[in-house]
Amino acid sequence: MRFLVACLVIALSVYFAFHGLEYDNGFIRFTKRSPANRTGVKAPQKSPFEEDDLMTWYMEDSDRQSYSLHYDYYQDSCPTAERIITKGIREIYDAKPSVAPSLIRLLFHDCFIEGCDASVLLDADESLTSEKEAPPNLSLKGFDVIESIKSELETVCPGVVSCADVLVLAAREAVLMAGGPFYPLETGRKDSVVAFKEIAERELPKPQASISVILASFATRGFNERETVSLFGAHSIGITHCTFFEDRLYNFSGTGKPDPELDTGFQQELKTKCPFSASAPSPGTGIGSSIPASDYGGVSSAGRGNDGAIDLSYNNEGGEENFGTRYYRRLMQKKGLMYADQQLTGREETEMWVRAYASDTQLFRRDFAMSMMKLSNYHVLTGPLGNLCDAAKLYLGLAITSHRRLKCVNAKSGLSSTSLSNKKAFLWF
C-alpha cells in the first residue's frame, strides 16, 4: 500500500512539473505550461536597437487590417497554388537571376500605389489608362513571369488564385532566392479593376528625393523610419544607370562640382564607368528626376547622357548572406550611388538604423522580413472589396472581374521576352 501511495505521489509530482494549478471560484484548474526549449539552440538576445516588439505589433496590426487574409487561404480551393508559384520562381531564377530584383521592384510599384491589388498588371484599353504607362513604371519587368505562373495556375485551378497573391508570393520567393530572409504571408487578396497612372507618376519615390520627402512618402503609408530604412536594403541587388546619379559626379546641385558627401575614391571609380556628359541632369529636372530605367527599360536612352550600368551587388560582394548589409556598409563609407540612398545617413533617426543594419545582419533580416510582410499587406482588397458586388450591378461586376482576370493573365509590359536577361533590374528607385 505504501508503495502504491509513493508511486502516486511521484506521478502527481511529475504531472505538476509540467502543469500548473489555478483556483477559479473555489475550483482547482489544471493549466498546461509551455514546454521547455529542447532544441539546444540558444535564443537570440534582443538587440539594443529593438526597443519595441515589432512582431507583436505587426500581428496586432495585421489582425486589424488583413480582414479575410489568412494562411493557407487556398488550402481547399487550390491546395497546390503556393507550391506552383515557388517552383516556378526557382526555375526561372536558376536560369535568370535578374528575376529577383525585377519582382521585388514590381511588388513595390504595385503596393506603394493604392495597395497590393495587382493594378500595376492591368493593360490599357478604351476605358482604362494603365499604370504601366506612368514614366516611373516604363522600365518595370517581370510581367511575363507573373503571366506564366498565373497561366499555369489557371490550368489547375481556373478563376481561383488572384494576381495580387501571385505577385506577393513570387516576390517573397525572389527575396529568398537572392539571399534574403523568408517571411510568412497570408493570402486571400483580390485584384483591382482600376489603375492609378496619375498617382504612380506623382507618388513613386525619385532617386534625387530628399530624406524629408522620402520619409514623408513612406509615413503616409504607415511606415516609420526604421521600416523605411530596412526596405531600402533591397537596393543591395539589381543595377542602376549612370544617368541617374552622374550629377553627383560632375554637377551636384548646379555647382559644377561633385557631391562632397561622395567618397572621393569611389567617385573616381564611378567616373571611369560614367564619363562626363554635357546632358547630365540636375536633381529635380528632366527625366533624371523620374525613376531610373532598368537594363531593358521602356524609355529610350537617347538624349539621356550616360547609360552605363552599375551592379548594385558589386559582384555579389560578401556573398548572398550579405544581402542588405553590404548596402548599409557602403552607405557608412559614403559610397551610396543614389542621392536618396546616401541621404539615409543625413538624419540621426535614419542613420542609427543604417549603422545598426551594417553591423547586425540578423537584426536587418528580421526587420526587413517584417517590413516586407507589412508592405505585402498594405491596403489589400479582400472579400467583396475587389469586385462590384452591388446587386443592381452584379452583371457589370462579373463582366469587369472576368475582363480584369484576362488582363492580368495576359499582362504584357510592351517589352520583348528578352526583358529578363542575365543582367539585373534596378529596384524601385
Each model region followed by its residue ranges:
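Catalytic cores of secreted/periplasmic or lumenal enzymes
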Residues: 1-429
